[in-house]
């Protein structure tokens, strides 16, 4: 029990939406790096599991998610990235998820999203928030260095393939993903970039993405990929969907988005997907948590709603 005493203390502080000290974050990130560096690019996950999409610093809504989905470690969780940026509590959100990973490493899987990057966080809020809360960029650096170790994808019972963004013209099989060197900043192009940036589309084949990174991919691509790899489903996040989840490509792909009323103004529901021991899935939708006024922050972050 002794080894987790500190982490239990961190978790109880964080659950009150209070940030840890810089030295506590350093300690936590060292422990997390040790765990994440042993995980695979396609991290195996057992069912039952609850699959979650983007959180984007909406801490109170993450608390609501745990209320609805169950607490760690009672529920086995898989998060598909984008913990930071845009919301007001990126620091507390990402620190809590990393602390839960360290405390319950076999019951929490955290993947990398396109926002878990040095470049993106300098534009969309996490960097500025770290500066505001700590007075220097050290905590931002600790986390962005840790992000390089996050697994890119997960595979539930060899059947459901989970990742932040989508498919890539450079990747036909899961073995290709296993062979990538993931410990680096998210590149501007190539397989690793595509996994974190691509989106499903109504047009067939691969197309250029309006995001300027990754590709769009059609139903033919999803069907072929699932067939080649013996998969029943690709589960991904990365796109705001008004009901919190959205099927496409003849149920070969599902998008899950777990930040309700995204950016405190989009009016969307959030959802999580529960997969039971028989691999049957159920979606739980939820509204934003009631919040007492937001901190006064001048927003310098550009809006991109893609």
Curated annotation (Swiss-Prot):
Q: Where in the cell is it found?
A: Cytoplasm, Cytosol; Nucleus speckle
> What is the enzyme's class at the highest EC level?
hydrolase
- PROSITE patterns the UniProt entry points to: SER_THR_PHOSPHATASE
The reply to whether Ubl conjugation figures as a keyword in the UniProt entry is: no
Binding-site list for Mn(2+) 2: 82, 114, 164, 238
**Note accompanying the cofactor annotation:** Binds 2 manganese ions per subunit.
Q: What is a GO molecular function of this protein?
A: myosin phosphatase activity
Where's it mainly located? Answer: cytoplasm
Please give the InterPro entries that the UniProt record associates with this protein.
Answer: Calcineurin-like_PHP_ApaH (IPR004843), Metallo-depent_PP-like (IPR029052), PPA2-like (IPR047129), Ser/Thr-sp_prot-phosphatase (IPR006186)
Which sites bind Mn(2+) 1? 54, 56, 82
Kindly list the cofactors needed. Answer: Mn(2+)
Per the record, residues carrying Leucine methyl ester are: 306
Q: How is it modified after translation?
A: Reversibly methyl esterified on Leu-306 by leucine carboxyl methyltransferase 1 (LCMT) and protein phosphatase methylesterase 1 (PPME1). Carboxyl methylation influences the affinity of the catalytic subunit for the different regulatory subunits, thereby modulating the PP2A holoenzyme's substrate specificity, enzyme activity and cellular localization.
GO BP term (any one): myosin filament assembly
The catalytic residues are 115
Q: Which family does it belong to?
A: Belongs to the PPP phosphatase family. PP-2A subfamily.
Subunit-level organization:
PP2A consists of a trimeric holoenzyme, composed of a 37 kDa catalytic subunit (C subunit) and a 65 kDa constant regulatory subunit (A subunit), that associates with a variety of regulatory subunits (B subunit) such as phr2AB (B55) and psrA (B56 homolog). The trimer may partially dissociates into a core 'AC' dimer equally active compared to the trimer.
Any idea what job this protein has? Plays a role in activating the myosin contractile function. Dephosphorylates threonine at 'Thr-1823', 'Thr-1833' and 'Thr-2029' in the C-terminal tail region of myosin II heavy chain (mhcA). Drives the assembly of dephosphorylated myosin II filaments to allow myosin recruitment into the cytoskeleton.
What is the name listed in the Swiss-Prot or TrEMBL entry for this protein? Serine/threonine-protein phosphatase 2A catalytic subunit A
Q: What is the lineage of its organism?
A: Eukaryota, Amoebozoa, Evosea, Eumycetozoa, Dictyostelia
State which gene encodes it. pho2a
